[in-house]
From Swiss-Prot:
<comment type="subunit">
    <text>Homodimer.</text>
</comment>
<dbReference type="InterPro" id="IPR015422">
    <property type="entry name" value="PyrdxlP-dep_Trfase_small"/>
</dbReference>
<keyword id="KW-0413">Isomerase</keyword>
<dbReference type="InterPro" id="IPR015424">
    <property type="entry name" value="PyrdxlP-dep_Trfase"/>
</dbReference>
<comment type="pathway">
    <text>Porphyrin-containing compound metabolism; protoporphyrin-IX biosynthesis; 5-aminolevulinate from L-glutamyl-tRNA(Glu): step 2/2.</text>
</comment>
<dbReference type="Pfam" id="PF00202">
    <property type="entry name" value="Aminotran_3"/>
</dbReference>
<dbReference type="GO" id="GO:0030170">
    <property type="term" value="F:pyridoxal phosphate binding"/>
</dbReference>
<keyword id="KW-0963">Cytoplasm</keyword>
<dbReference type="GO" id="GO:0005737">
    <property type="term" value="C:cytoplasm"/>
</dbReference>
<feature type="modified residue" description="N6-(pyridoxal phosphate)lysine">
    <location>
        <position position="267"/>
    </location>
</feature>
<comment type="similarity">
    <text>Belongs to the class-III pyridoxal-phosphate-dependent aminotransferase family. HemL subfamily.</text>
</comment>
<dbReference type="GO" id="GO:0042286">
    <property type="term" value="F:glutamate-1-semialdehyde 2,1-aminomutase activity"/>
</dbReference>
<keyword id="KW-0663">Pyridoxal phosphate</keyword>
<protein>
    <recommendedName>
        <fullName>Glutamate-1-semialdehyde 2,1-aminomutase</fullName>
        <ecNumber>5.4.3.8</ecNumber>
    </recommendedName>
</protein>
<dbReference type="InterPro" id="IPR015421">
    <property type="entry name" value="PyrdxlP-dep_Trfase_major"/>
</dbReference>
<dbReference type="InterPro" id="IPR049704">
    <property type="entry name" value="Aminotrans_3_PPA_site"/>
</dbReference>
<dbReference type="GO" id="GO:0008483">
    <property type="term" value="F:transaminase activity"/>
</dbReference>
Length: 430
């Protein structure tokens, strides 16, 4: 499989774009080599500039739950664009989106549209601080909530130390308000609240962690967070940018039957276009301007073309049996790869929730936290990744990113993927 045109484009891109990409993970630093440049998508397939075809399990990092260029989504976008690309004023379409989200997401009484997941989480944090009058937030190691200053923070040297920045350019005074503990460790959360509880505005958590690959909550974890927030008057924020409409129609909160105070959304809700949203309890959301004193605004918020793409997608995923089929296809894929890894005598485990999955090259039976994920055999993943790419299978170019199945993936696509995996894993074991 040649990538001459991709390589040429990457060299050209580096002359005018930092690192040649507009988001770091696209640069292939996690797997080595140079990125693939794509030109079009159709259903479960992507086509690169060298006319290679791939079965796609990235799906634009999650949004394309109905596959590439679904005719109903494309038609909705074309119709909306013909009426105008944006007005910077209210439209009926954004009302329909708000009504749909409040009907489908258990926690949402009111919702505000934004243009990205980072905007959504940043705004939800500000709102939680404004509502509680507190400054500190608690997040979990390995969970990614966008690139806002208060969220690019890691734990200090001990469980009770204040946070430190993970990027230059973030003031220590900002990072110190962010406390970080291990995902799925309720004991650490309780210890932090024992010391700082009256100062903590919010816990922000992914119901299923998707940036340490795919790590679901252990039984009782989300329920425990709900109880702790209730006990201390803190706001529970579910970051469902990734899990929203991906693991279930009502997101992770419906799947696990735990209702947060605020929810952030993105990805699927935009149908492939740049959209984010945050919403929740009426009492909290009424703190947002123009009703309340907590300021938030956006020139492109509620863009009519993006709303049309999102609404068309949300209509499709409400079809009877949609999520049952998505989960079955994902399970076929994951179980098939695990079986072929066993046949090749290569240690591997996997996690799957709905149409979201993660593969881990490890002898451990279960991956439940970031430390375990980082201790997996990363070099083996790199070899597996490039082997699958050569066979026309496109996974995320990082061992710490979840994979996604769409409704466009049929049995033929799964079978072709498993055939490629069998060959690649056999070669890795030789």
């Amino acid at each position: 499989m040649t990538q001459i045109h991709s390589d040429n484009l990457f060299r050209r891109a580096q002359a005018h774009i930092p690192g040649g990409v507009n988001s770091p993970v696209r640069a292939f630093k996690g797997v080595g080599g140079e990125p693939v440049f794509f030109v079009r998508g159709e259903g479960a397939y992507l086509y690169d500039v060298d006319d290679n075809r791939y079965i796609d399990y990235v799906n634009s990092w999650g949004p394309l739950i109905v596959g590439h260029t679904h005719p109903e989504v494309v038609a909705a976008v074309q119709e909306a664009a013909a009426q105008g690309l944006g007005f910077g004023a209210p439209t009926a379409t954004e009302i329909e989106m708000a009504e749909t989200l409040c009907r489908l997401v258990p926690s949402m009484d009111l919702v505000r549209m934004v243009s990205s997941g980072t905007e959504a989480t940043m705004s939800a944090i500000r709102l939680a601080r404004g509502f509680t009058g507190r400054d500190k937030i608690l997040k979990f190691e390995g969970c990614y909530h966008g690139h806002a200053d208060s969220l690019l923070v890691k734990a200090g040297s001990g469980a009770l130390t204040l946070g430190v920045p993970t990027s230059p350019g973030i003031p220590l005074a900002v990072a110190e308000h962010t406390l970080t503990v291990s995902y799925n460790n309720l004991g650490e959360v309780q210890e932090i609240f024992n010391h700082f509880g009256e100062q903590i505005a919010a816990i922000i958590v992914e119901p299923v962690a998707g940036n340490m690959n795919c790590v679901p909550p252990v039984p009782g974890f989300l329920e425990g967070l709900r109880t702790i927030c209730d006990d201390y008057g803190s706001v529970l924020i579910f970051d469902e940018v990734m899990t929203g409409f991906r693991v279930a129609l009502g997101g992770g909160q419906a799947f696990y039957d735990v209702t947060p105070d605020l929810t952030t959304l993105g990805k699927v809700v935009g149908g492939g276009l740049p959209v984010g949203a945050f919403g929740g309890r009426q009492k909290i959301m009424e703190m947002i301007a123009p009703l309340g004193p907590v300021y938030q605004a956006g020139t492109l918020s509620g863009n009519p073309v993006a709303m049309a793409a999102g609404l068309a997608t949300l209509k499709l995923i409400q079809a009877p049996g949609f999520y049952e089929h998505l989960s079955r296809q994902t399970q076929k894929l994951v179980n098939g790869i695990l079986g072929r890894a066993r046949d090749a005598d290569i240690p591997m485990t996997a996690n799957q929730v709905g149409g979201m999955f993660g593969l881990f090259f490890t002898g451990e039976e279960e991956i439940t936290c970031y430390e375990q994920a980082t201790n997996c055999h990363l070099d083996r993943f790199k070899s597996f990744y490039h082997g699958m790419l050569e066979h026309g299978i496109y996974f995320a170019p990082s061992a710490f990113e979840a994979g996604f199945v769409s409704s466009a993936h049929n049995d033929e696509h799964i079978a072709a993927t498993l055939q490629a995996a069998e060959r690649v894993l056999a070669k890795l074991s030789s």
